[in-house]
């Protein structure tokens, strides 16, 4: 069985393949594996809406079951932002580095005890027959004042999960997968994928 994962993000694709591989025996294709796949605008107001937009489009275009996620960082001191704008927080041409620096600038004067944040993920499955399944995952933690670690991507170098002394960028891939928002969402989605594809 083949499944398309509606992302071009190589780091995310690898992370999601690692998480799904032991649970659901399917060949996972990314959008980069498909010819001339267009960009799909993420116009939703929530992570779930954006994930459904991407998965519905991928299922319709490929005729394959499609999985998509939308995830981001919700910072308490920024009223839950950058949220669904996490990947493009620093504007046109946003990069992980620019986004991370902007968040650090925006919370620079926030005291340590008020630097709470959460990584949030909505993961969805959409089949060509119209079956839709949704799973959510969240990991809470604290924003550091400076980046630490070189693993992971995005805001990982400034996010320390609750109960941890390390950032998610200081963890191995297996350690991060075990606690991450995406790991939680996709482990919850995996049995739904298995039953929908049975």
Residue ranges with predicted function:
Residues 1-4, 10-198:
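Anionic-ligand binding patches
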